Regions:
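An intracellular "coupling" helix at the cytosolic face of ABC transporter transmembrane type-1 domains
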Residues: 267-268, 280-292, 296, 300, ...
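Transmembrane helix-loop-helix hairpins at lipid-water interfaces of multipass membrane proteins
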Residues: 105, 111-112, 182-238, 242, ...
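Membrane-integrated ABC transporters
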Residues: 1-197, 215, 239, 243, ...
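ABC ATPase nucleotide-binding domain helical subdomain, centered on the C-loop/LSGGQ "ABC signature"
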Residues: 578-619, 664
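Primarily ABC-family ATPase nucleotide-binding module
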Residues: 475-518, 668-673
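Hydrophobic alpha-helical segments in the permease module
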Residues: 224-236, 327-332, 404-415, 434-456
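Transmembrane helices of ABC transporter permease
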Residues: 223-231, 236, 297-348, 421-432
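Cytosolic ends of transmembrane helices, especially the final helix of ABC transmembrane type-1 domains
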Residues: 352, 375, 447-477
Length: 701
């Protein structure tokens, strides 16, 4: 009876989860609610079952389909609350009964309070209430939450290249840290006020000494000054800690964004690009962190100290107010007039540095070519050309920086001299006390001392804009569309190629499970383009591809590639042999990995290694040889039990013994795969059911 009740209540439970998901992304108005509901319906159809067990799966798959990064985590109540306090948004289902699941959204974006949304109602609550709510379903044990970062959209969500200025990128990068940056500014303002303690104390001391010789006022001044300076040191310590937290978050956010973005890049748009070299720009995050820290700690403090000092000077005398105006105008002239072209030249210099890094990467990638006499000369000549280009760009940028530094140093000397002359005249005229003159000199010493550091901070600012511009190259990598079907309506696993133009001819074929097609070509790339189009990596310009009656574009990219496997070039990442085969797919057991490698007769070779399947491979595949690595790529594809297998010339380089084993494994009756192979070998094509020969003249069959 309970089971029947659960089934009857399933639509109600699904509706509760859907409403919670809509509340989960209520702060993202760019998400279409129609697309959201369509994705949710697809997820509930594919993962049919009890909402109490599957609500988190429905949520993550739905959000993934609309391009929202979400992560399901198992955590304690305390950890969930800490996530909310850090600004995350959580979807939890702490309590459920036979009528279904009752999800709740916990929104921690507000710094003052945490809000919860349940059954369409929103209210602010205290931490104690959140803790009680989360404990209501499972005591103090682990709870499952789906977590999203509400600030993820500030890293320039790219469905294509965007024209964004470097300064805008800095704002987008730092905007999620705005609350902490304001805290740093407040701390800097307090420190700026406390820097006045020394000149004011000196002013009081001069006046005290001038009118008497009592020791008690001096002691009181010393104690007060010590107190203020100690408090200032404590505030600077807190400021340093906050900036350190910002620096950590900056790295974590950019790294997380790229780990999400890179596996979703549109391969069709990356043709002709050296992606590994492009990814080197991530190293600019270290410079971004360092410069951000420097500007937040020193730059902001310098600006506020200068501003506060100028305000105090203005209160001393109207002439000193005019002195402030001249200083402000001069600083504006330094930054905006003398700095024209500084950002552009800094970016150009940075590009030249990456050109050098790209060339060195080429030298490391082609050891055979460059270990010859001619190769060494080519390496040196190209390096000299790149170095000359860098030096030219550096000179151009430094000329902008140098004129700013020279004017700042001149301003430092002129302002100190002018204040001394002006202040002395005001003291002689009786319009300024001697103590005020001394205090004014100390304040201006702080201000003009900042001018001496202006060059360093301007150089850091230019470096920040250049490094963020380089990170922007990664943020602008075009990503695949996240939407599409999670599961098709049919389960025939057929592949239909209709009026596909390949080799100068229009061809059509329908392949059912167990049927194979060979595309025999020598030097053409038509077969590769067709395979990439089936896999969703490329576009087909003529003809149609249907998988179970649907175009590859109708599927969500990741679900398409669960049904379709592609064996292309050898792709090995740093990890164990087992990791390189199973790719962390939870449905693939170690036994399945061993079974497929045994079928390909790789198991003995692997077990002869010291660590067996736990042997670490580097990016070159060492210690396995090329033939073993090619078979490993085949094992990676087959172990996932795809419905359609695409092989792009991966069999051509195998020796006859390995080829025989590979074909025997591929064509085993138990697999019932739709297999499409591009090859230049007629003996391979002869083993398959159908052959499209691109070696024949157009019009032949």
């Amino acid at each position: 009876m309970a089971v029947v009740e659960t089934v009857d209540n399933r639509p109600r439970a699904e509706g509760a989860v859907l409403r919670a998901v809509e509340q989960f992304v209520v702060h993202m108005p760019e998400i279409s609610r129609v697309e959201l509901r369509r994705a949710f319906h697809s997820a509930t159809n594919f993962w049919a079952g009890d909402a109490r067990e599957l609500w988190w799966r429905w949520t993550t798959e739905t959000l993934d389909s609309v391009g929202v990064r979400a992560q399901a985590v198992d955590c304690t109540v305390a950890e969930a609350i800490e996530l909310a306090r850090e600004g995350a948004i959580l979807l939890c289902a702490p309590d459920h009964d036979e009528s279904g699941v009752h999800p709740v959204v916990i929104d921690g974006r507000s710094q003052r309070s945490i809000s919860i949304r349940k059954e369409g109602q929103r209210r602010n609550v205290r931490l104690k209430q959140v803790r009680s709510l989360l404990k209501s379903g499972g005591g103090t044990g682990m709870i499952r939450c789906v977590v999203i970062d509400p600030d993820q959209k500030h890293l320039v969500k790219s469905m294509g290249p965007a024209k964004v200025k470097p300064l805008q990128r800095v704002w987008q990068l730092l905007r999620p840290e705005s609350s902490d940056i304001w805290l740093v500014v407040v701390f800097a303002f307090v420190v700026g006020l406390l820097t006045l303690a020394t000149p004011i104390a000196v002013e009081s001391l001069v006046n005290t000494v001038a009118f008497g010789r009592f020791l008690q006022p001096v002691i009181v001044l010393a104690i007060l000054l010590m107190s203020f300076l100690t408090f200032s040191a404590a505030v600077i310590g807190l400021q340093t800690y906050v900036v350190e937290i910002i620096e950590r978050r900056l790295f974590a956010r950019v790294a997380a964004d790229l780990s999400y973005r890179l596996p979703r890049t549109s391969q069709n748009k990356l043709k002709g690009h050296d992606v590994p070299e492009t990814v080197n720009r991530f190293l600019d995050i270290a410079l971004t962190q360092k410069v951000t820290t420097s500007l937040l700690l020193d730059g902001v403090g310098l600006l506020l100290s200068t501003f506060i000092g100028m305000v105090v000077l203005a209160f001393y005398h109207p002439f000193l107010l005019g002195f402030d105006v001249v200083l402000l105008a001069s600083i504006t002239f330094i930054v905006f007039v003398l700095g024209r072209g500084g950002v552009k030249s800094a970016i150009d210099e940075s590009k030249k540095k990456y050109a050098a890094a790209a060339w060195f990467e080429e030298l490391a990638r082609c050891p055979v070519a460059f270990h010859t006499s001619a190769g060494r000369e080519l390496a040196a000549d190209r390096a000299n050309t790149i170095i000359a280009a860098y030096l030219s760009a550096r000179r151009e940028h430094f000329s902008v920086l140098m004129r700013q530094i020279i004017f700042a140093l001149f301003l430092q000397a002129a302002s100190s001299t002018l204040l001394l002359g002006l202040g002395g005249w005001l003291v002689i005229s009786g319009e300024l006390t001697l103590g005020q003159l001394v205090a004014a000199e100390l304040i201006v010493a702080v201000i003009v001392g900042g001018f001496a550091k202006l060059g360093k901070h301007l150089a850091s600012f230019y470096d920040l804009l250049a490094s963020v511009d380089k990170l922007g190259v990664l943020f602008d990598l075009e990503t695949e569309k996240p939407s599409g079907l999670i599961s098709p309506p049919g389960h025939m696993h057929s592949l239909q190629l209709e009026d596909v133009v390949i080799g100068g001819r229009s061809r059509s074929i329908i392949l059912s499970p167990g049927e194979t097609l060979a595309i025999l070509e020598e030097n053409q790339m038509s077969g590769e383009q067709l395979l990439h189009a089936i896999y969703g990596f490329d576009d087909l310009h003529e003809g149609h591809i249907l998988i179970d009656g649907l175009s590859p574009d109708d599927f969500r990219p990741d679900t398409l590639r669960e049904r379709v496997a592609l064996v292309d070039d050898i792709e090995i990442f740093s990890g164990t042999i087992e990791e390189n085969v199973d790719l962390n797919r939870f449905q693939i057991s170690p036994a399945a990995v061993r079974e497929i490698t045994t079928e390909l007769e790789l198991a003995d070779d692997i077990l002869h290694l010291a660590d067996g399947y736990d042997t670490k491979l580097n990016s070159t595949g060492h210690p396995l040889n090329r033939n073993q690595l090619q078979l490993l790529m085949l094992a990676r594809a087959l172990v996932g039990r795809p419905h359609i297998l695409l092989i792009n010339r991966a069999l051509d380089s195998l020796p006859d013994d390995d080829l025989e084993r590979a074909l025997s494994c591929l064509l085993a009756p138990k697999r019932q795969l739709v297999t499409v192979v591009t090859t230049g070998r007629r003996d391979i094509a002869a083993c398959l059911n159908s052959v499209w020969s691109l070696q024949d003249t157009p019009g032949s069959h």
